[in-house]
């Protein structure tokens, strides 16, 4: 069994207009299903129902992109200008072997045509994979800055809070570890312009936004990743922290 670990930072603020706790969430620019397909994280020998389910979980635009059979365009949709030539060559050869050589993509297009509905782009807590010899907290801080543009001096880490969640997809165990931070007063205003921080963020992020608990619940119902079991306890911790702080 393979284990993949990601580490993130739940960063909160008190919205001074509505007196609600909010946290920063980022939205991926592509669906998890699309990423899994492009990186060949599936079995070509799996039953058709499993493959169709993967296409079901893509957005309509992603399915249309796959139907072009243009792997360069699919790859660019995820990586943009990031130079990962060795990985690209490896994944292209697998795509070519799986779908182009047998029948010039006819089976792939047929499977996509059987897909129904539309997947959603994932909202999640800023997180990422640790580098070699990097501590969990250092990783969380680095990933948060890379994805939001907010640097370390603008928030306070609350070291008493650390929470993790895991899930297993039949082949790989995914473990997410989260730390908690509170934004400094200077950035608590509701009109804080996150778009300025976002403009030069990494390619995988499409949006960044403050979300309260009601919004977190709404988002969780519309996607496969349920954020409430992580963000709910974090908000409760913040409430107690603010109560005793004052």
From Swiss-Prot:
GO terms for biological process: AMP biosynthetic process; ATP biosynthetic process; symbiont-mediated suppression of host gene expression. Residues 93-239 form the Nudix hydrolase domain. The keyword Nucleotide-binding does not apply. It is an enzyme of class 3 (hydrolase). The active site is at residue 143. GO terms for molecular function: bis(5'-nucleosyl)-tetraphosphatase (asymmetrical) activity; diphosphoinositol-polyphosphate diphosphatase activity; metal ion binding; RNA binding. A motif (Nudix box) lies at residues 128-149. Its cofactor is Mg(2+); Mn(2+). The keyword Repeat does not apply. GO terms for cellular component: host cell rough endoplasmic reticulum. Mg(2+) binds at residues 134, 147, 169. It is found in: Host rough endoplasmic reticulum. Keywords: Early protein, Eukaryotic host gene expression shutoff by virus, Host endoplasmic reticulum, Host gene expression shutoff by virus, Host-virus interaction, Hydrolase, Late protein, Magnesium, Manganese, Metal-binding, Multifunctional enzyme, RNA-binding. Its main location: host cell. Induction: Expressed early and up to late in the infection cycle. It catalyses: diphospho-myo-inositol polyphosphate + H2O = myo-inositol polyphosphate + phosphate. Pfam families: NUDIX. Its EC number is 3.1.3.-, 3.6.1.52. Decapping enzyme required for the removal of the 5'-end m7GpppN cap tethered to viral and host mRNAs to allow their decay in cells. May therefore accelerate viral and cellular mRNA turnover to eliminate competing host mRNAs and allow stage-specific synthesis of viral proteins. Acceleration of the turnover of cellular transcripts may even promote the shutoff of host protein synthesis. In addition to the mRNA cap, g5R also efficiently hydrolyzes diphosphoinositol polyphosphates. Belongs to the Nudix hydrolase family. DIPP subfamily. Interacts with host RPL23A. This is mRNA-decapping protein g5R. The lineage of its organism: Viruses, Varidnaviria, Bamfordvirae, Nucleocytoviricota, Pokkesviricetes.
